[in-house]
Curated annotation (Swiss-Prot):
UniProt lineage: Bacteria, Pseudomonadati, Pseudomonadota, Alphaproteobacteria, Sphingomonadales
Record's protein name: Na(+)/H(+) antiporter NhaA
UniProt subcellular location: Cell inner membrane
Encoding gene (name): nhaA
Keywords: Antiport, Cell inner membrane, Cell membrane, Ion transport, Membrane, Sodium, Sodium transport, Transmembrane, Transmembrane helix, Transport
Source organism: Zymomonas mobilis subsp. mobilis (strain ATCC 31821 / ZM4 / CP4)
Cited Pfam families: Na_H_antiport_1
The UniProt record lists the keyword Cytoplasm: no
């Protein structure tokens, strides 16, 4: 790994503060005397004449700049698998199993709570994600209360969570498909794979192909953020000269600061825009917000911790060094902080629907409860170095 874990967490901490402040600003403006102007700007239609239903500004931010976010995510995953903390099966298996458990149980819990309401079934994936941008800085602030091995486990789990979230978006949140555009997207992808096989090092060739791919995917009906994923996978991870950085590393170095300091805060500012005037216990106990909130606050830790216990008891994997099950339970509580990806999936599932704002209520409620419970558990309980 090119950077220390502490440096990685420190960068995440600074970005999380800006993201949180931006989200709070969006929430404040949407509940102030400026709310009408705020929502009017967000609903401005973008000039995409090739599309029957052109996206508004808020939707455009979710499909264009966020493509760069997914590029950075897949670049991180690729680097970790090739030469980082996910480079061996032994290191991969426990966080992968934990992430799968943390995906299935929240989705099932949401489905159970919303059963009988088919119109909200598309929201099943909202509580499956863990937001590393908020989770990692919290455990950095906890310092010695969380072992280095546990931090690495959580980082790997968050990476797999993002990867699984990308797969879910690609498979379950496509709109009506355009065969010609889909064929064009497949052709561009094949060209990019060919460039990789030829070890073409020119970063801008891939960037240009990625932009065309993004447009083809947008027209095709598949979610265009997948273009960021494909571009990240296509970029060579090895340079043609030892003293040079690889195209993948150069691309990440260029884009990552923009994602951290501009794109994610902009997304938070736009996505957290919702009126709180309708919030009440009656509204919060409706199927959608309750399903999302409990999916995050209960489903996430049950799924993550349950899968971790199963993997260790069956001797499929071992606990990280210096880590106990009680410590991992506290971290499992923090996994219920779902913000960026949860909001993103909520926008996909309920765009233009009356269920979007209640879903955001659920994300806010579940994430706050998870953060508070995880912090208190890890801050005030004492953990042995081994055992439970």
């Amino acid at each position: 790994m090119r950077f220390s874990i502490r440096r990685f967490f420190s960068a995440a901490s600074g970005g999380a503060i800006i993201l949180l402040l931006s989200a709070l600003l969006g929430l404040l403006l949407s509940n102030s005397f400026l709310s009408e102007s705020y929502f009017k700007v967000l609903h401005l239609k973008m000039p995409f004449s090739a599309l029957d239903d052109a996206p508004n500004l808020a939707e455009f931010i979710s499909i264009a700049p966020m493509s760069l976010f997914f590029f950075v995510v897949i670049a991180e995953i690729k680097e970790e698998i090739i030469s980082g903390h996910l480079a061996s099966f032994r290191r991969v298996i426990l966080p992968l199993i934990s992430a799968l458990g943390g995906m299935m149980i929240p989705a099932c819990l949401y489905g159970l709570i919303t059963s009988g309401h088919l119109e909200v079934s598309r929201g099943w994936a909202i509580p499956i994600a863990t937001d590393a941008a908020f989770t990692l800085p919290i455990i950095l602030a906890l310092g010695r209360h969380v072992s280095e091995g546990a931090r690495v486990w959580l980082m790997a789990l968050a990476i797999f969570d993002d990867l699984l979230g990308i797969v879910v978006i690609a498979l379950f949140y496509a709109s009506h498909l355009n065969g010609y555009a889909l064929f064009a997207a497949g052709l561009i992808t094949a060209v990019m794979i060919g460039l990789n096989k030829k070890s073409v090092q020119n970063l801008w060739v891939y960037a240009s192909a990625g932009v065309v791919l993004w447009w083809a995917l947008l027209v095709s009906g598949l979610h265009p953020t997948i273009a960021g994923v494909i571009t990240g996978l296509a970029l060579p991870s090895v340079a043609d000269q030892p003293e040079k950085a690889s195209p993948l590393e150069r691309g990440k170095q260029i884009i990552a600061p923009w994602v951290t300091w501009l794109i994610l805060p902009l997304f938070g500012f736009v996505s957290m825009g919702m009126s709180l005037s309708a919030m009440s216990f009656h509204v919060l106990l409706a199927p959608v917000p309750l399903g999302v909130a409990l999916g995050l606050f209960l489903g996430k830790p049950i799924g993550v911790f349950g899968a971790t216990i199963m993997a260790t008891r069956l001797k499929i994997a071992t606990l990280p060094k210096g880590t106990s099950l009680r410590m991992l339970f506290g971290l499992s509580l923090l996994c219920g902080i779902g913000f960026t990806i949860s909001l993103f999936i909520a926008e996909l599932a309920f765009s233009g629907s009356d269920f979007l704002v209640p879903a955001k209520y659920g994300i806010l409620m579940g994430s706050l409860l998870s953060a508070l419970a995880g912090w208190l558990w890890l801050r005030f309980l004492k953990f042995p170095a081994k055992g439970v």
